[in-house]
UniProtKB/Swiss-Prot annotation:
Family, as annotated: Belongs to the BPG-independent phosphoglycerate mutase family.
This protein's name: 2,3-bisphosphoglycerate-independent phosphoglycerate mutase
Name of encoding gene: gpmI
Function: Catalyzes the interconversion of 2-phosphoglycerate and 3-phosphoglycerate.
Organism of provenance: Shewanella loihica (strain ATCC BAA-1088 / PV-4)
Residues that, per the record, bind substrate: H125, R155, D156, R187, R193, R263, A264, D265, R266, K336
Summary of subunit composition and partner proteins: Monomer.
Amino acid sequence: MTTRKRPLALLILDGWGYRENTHMNAVYHANTPVLDRLNKEYPNSLISGSGLDVGLPDGQMGNSEVGHINIGSGRVVYQELTRIGKSIEDGEFDSNPAFVDAVDKAIAADGAVHIMGLLSPGGVHSHESHIQAMCKMAVARGAKQVYLHAFLDGRDTPPRSAKGSLQAFNELFAELGTGRIASLIGRYYAMDRDNRWDRVSQAYELITQGKALHLYQDAVEALDAAYGRDENDEFVASSAITDADGQVATLNDNDALIFMNFRADRARQITRSFVDPGFDGFERAVTPKINFVMLTEYAADIKAPVAYPSVDLVNTLGEVLQNNGKTQLRISETEKYAHVTFFFNGGKEEPFEGEDRILIQSPKVATYDLQPEMSSTELTDKLVEAIESTQYDVIICNYPNGDMVGHTGNFDAAVKACEAVDACIGRVVEALAKVDGECLITADHGNAEQMTDEQTGQAHTAHTSELVPLIYVGRKGEIAPNGRLSDLAPTMLTLMGQTVPSEMTGHSIITLSE
């Protein structure tokens, strides 16, 4: 016979933010009697789900992946862009063992330090501030030859916007007294991810041999010439930049080659061409024995030092519940199933012991504004059934409607989506009351509360940086101000009378008064 549980549920209303401005605010205009009542009768607050509070750059809107990682891990998990930027600020970057080892070996062998990456402020695959820090660090350690191989963007930045970056690096090298931009090529070639090896080979030959379609004495001159050929940044053909004596830079034995992209998908192919012993993507004229460094791990089977290995998240909420012999359920529709499982568990695919999962198929419609309620009724049927079974200590549920319908930009549909979720919450709260359970109602980030762009008047389909709600439907108590998503797991453990592990840097923000 199974022991009867008093479940604690976490209901995540995806894309449901709070916004003072009520214009085209679907959350405000929706008829939500259940949430209105709960807000009057139970402790509630607003918490942060964006920017630095979830490990993103300041002001950056939150997203579902980041939100669920922060909620499930009970700590602020710094995303790569922020994590590396923070290490530069803290001074840790300059003593990073992978960088130090490669640079020092090159210097000792009288070799060169080559730095390659997407020279862009885009922040999607790389950030030029990281590349700048790497150039400074190499020179500070005594490198006499520093060569920058610049991949140009034009996708995550305007199509012709590289000139400012190139000018800034020309100035940087002048200040440092050594180093130069050695080559330019569009990301179309260097960062292919579809096994179009003919493209990658052009970048490889450019970096290793200085072999290029075009030869120039200055990077800005090279860019201007590319624009003259009607090549936008992304498509700039291979261009080698010579030194004052007309010599091109080449990659030789004992040189260091440091790849400054942090996003893996478009970094893998060119990396394999430099480090895989059995590489067969294209015929390589030269294969210098170099000290290669990946900024982050691009793939588990690429054998090269990694400057910033992925952080293994231990003692996430799911793991703590497992270790304490508790049972848990994860439930959502297809659209957010990975979020309440894989992302909530800190990037681990396998369920924990005692963790059950229920997947409800999202409706097969072209866009969700055609069915704004999505599969919320069926999801709630299964959720209520699970609550009534009293077999779970903790239930994690995500309602995707606010986000998925918010992305369509259809205001009327977003209002209907919010109303559908409100009705479902009424059923869930009622079921919990019958078994003496309680719940936290929150969101991972905003979306549906802003359905129009105030500047352009066009539909606003993106996430927002607004605060998100938190309601505690349970015992008497109060919620501390200034909470964030990483506080939810410690709060849940505290409500259950469980010890919060030291790895969780969030805090319990609910104080019970009974």
